[in-house]
Regions:
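Extended, low-hydrophobicity, polar/charged segments
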Residues: 1-159
Length: 159
């Protein structure tokens, strides 16, 4: 059930063996934490937004929520999620499996600092039945991220 595109993407960057297949869905932060056996905060949720009519991906800790003011300061627009029925077309992945690995090259990937407090984080692996275990630094390398950002709120209370 693994996503071959994601498997090859990770393998080509030296992260072979990090993709884990699950018997139950990990389509939400809650489901992912239950299947992986970690806190919900350690789930690296991948959100896809429209900025200037183009997709942008932001990966953040599972307990983080988008802070509109911080988002606008970075992207110069209010946060607007990609409509659910357009997620596959724009990112290459279905909702519940969107990940920062193997998205089209013209989509910038940002990592929120909310994940830096953890030894490991767990983003989806391209579908709702796979995840990847990486340190935040490894996630930065594996995702070809633009860099780190600060667009979340809510997670500071749980540090």
């Amino acid at each position: 059930m693994r996503n071959e595109k994601v498997y090859e993407w990770l393998k080509n960057r030296g992260f072979e063996g990090r993709l884990t297949e699950h018997s139950e869905t990990i389509d939400t932060v809650e489901h992912a934490a239950q299947q992986i056996g970690c806190s919900e905060a350690e789930i690296a949720k991948t959100l896809s937004f429209i900025v200037d009519d183009k997709p942008v991906v932001v990966v953040m800790a599972g307990d983080g929520r988008v802070n509109s003011s911080k988002f606008k300061a970075l992207f110069h627009t209010k946060p607007s999620m990609i409509p659910r029925d357009m997620v596959v077309e724009m990112t290459g992945f279905a909702p519940g499996g969107v990940c920062p690995f193997g998205v089209p090259a013209d989509i910038p990937i940002w990592l929120d600092i909310s994940m830096k407090r953890f030894e490991y984080v767990h983003p989806a692996g391209g579908n709702e039945f796979t995840s990847v275990r990486l340190t935040p630094e490894e996630l930065e390398k594996a995702s070809d991220a633009v860099g780190w950002c600060d667009v979340c709120k809510g997670w500071e209370e749980t540090v």
